[in-house]
């Protein structure tokens, strides 16, 4: 007997049940090519019923809990201590929306170190902070909706970040509808509003309080929250892809300007490092090999060469890999582009 979705979120027993539901081979197949089990029900429908819908429910409950913690401003850690969250007003005051190109005049570093890591982007940003860096974390944002589909339990990266932090208090102020929907957050409607500009749009959220672990650990509350600044920029959704696996020139040029916007926002706010990801290569189906090349191209442009002490791509291959747009997954194309394929299974920081 498995706990209800709410109990699964809140209890250790529930987490074990969740793991069992996701991993247990419940159905036997008579036709693997069509994915039809013996009872004749299409496998995808069974997945939605037994697994995915439960996950969506759990994510929705986690987000509701996150909103309550943001409102009260503190939580009880796993070790039993009361931990104060970074004041939401800090994040709100340090937030701004960008919609035009601009140039940042700042000193350059002697060189930029490039890393491609197979790990959670938030955890890698925390590692950099512990090592003395001042990173900004890229949020793979939705162009039209702050937080994407977080209220509906989506598993994409932006929604994951919103469940783990107070990022929404920054993003929601740029949506009059969200400000009215969540009066308890005490937000003031910004003059700048969603949707973001398609070419130069981005949002900087300073000192976002991250206080939950990754989904793989049940979004457990952290003993020590981290303040991490976030850059939200939206990739192209569903670009055209040729037989060579590349986007046409129009989409390429648009993506280049989006990448330049990410870099400029990081520079404009004094960050010495960026934690990026496979920009748009999941739900938005951008080709990772081409996206990696475009990042590399922008890094070598005079405006951005050595603008950062470190640029890292933290990439976890999820369920949307091995598809037409990313047959090798998302991690490997970036490793190849930046010559970061691990040797003997190890890589540096």
Language-model segments: which ranges?
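Extreme N-terminal basic, low-complexity initiation segments
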Residues: 1-9, 15
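Macrodomain-like recognition of ADP-ribose-binding/processing modules
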Residues: 14, 21, 29-35, 39-274, ...
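Basic, glycine-rich
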Residues: 26
């Amino acid at each position: 007997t498995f706990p209800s979705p709410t109990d699964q979120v809140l209890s250790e027993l529930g987490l074990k049940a969740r793991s069992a539901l996701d991993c247990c081979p419940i159905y036997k197949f008579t036709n693997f090519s069509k994915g039809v089990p013996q009872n004749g029900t299409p496998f995808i429908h069974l997945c939605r019923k037994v697994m995915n819908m439960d996950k969506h429910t759990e994510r929705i409950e986690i987000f509701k809990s996150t909103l309550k913690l943001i409102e009260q401003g503190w939580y009880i850690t796993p070790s039993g201590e009361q931990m104060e969250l970074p004041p939401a007003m800090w994040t709100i005051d340090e937030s701004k929306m960008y919609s035009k190109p601009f140039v940042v005049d700042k000193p350059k570093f002697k060189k930029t170190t490039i890393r491609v890591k197979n790990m959670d982007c938030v955890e890698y940003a925390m590692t950099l902070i512990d090592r003395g860096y001042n990173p900004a974390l890229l949020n793979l944002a939705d162009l039209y909706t702050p937080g994407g589909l977080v209220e509906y339990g989506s598993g994409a990266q932006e929604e994951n970040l919103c469940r783990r932090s107070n990022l929404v208090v920054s993003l929601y102020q740029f949506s009059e509808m969200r400000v009215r929907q969540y009066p308890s957050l005490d937000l003031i409607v910004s003059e700048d509003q969603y949707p973001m500009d398609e070419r130069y749009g981005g949002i900087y959220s300073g000192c976002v309080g991250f206080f939950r672990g990754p989904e793989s650990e049940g979004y457990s509350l952290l003993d020590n929250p981290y303040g991490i600044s976030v850059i939200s920029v939206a990739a192209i959704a569903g670009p055209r892809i040729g037989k060579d696996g590349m986007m046409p020139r129009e989409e390429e040029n648009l993506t280049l300007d989006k990448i330049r916007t990410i870099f400029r926002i990081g520079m404009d706010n004094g960050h010495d490092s960026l934690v990026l990801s496979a920009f748009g290569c999941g739900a938005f189906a951008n080709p990772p090999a081409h996206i990696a090349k475009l990042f590399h191209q922008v890094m070598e442009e005079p405006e951005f060469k050595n603008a950062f002490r470190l640029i890292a791509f933290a990439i976890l291959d999820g369920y949307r890999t091995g598809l037409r747009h990313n047959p090798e997954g998302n991690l490997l194309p970036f490793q190849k582009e930046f010559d970061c394929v691990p040797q003997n299974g190890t890589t540096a920081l």
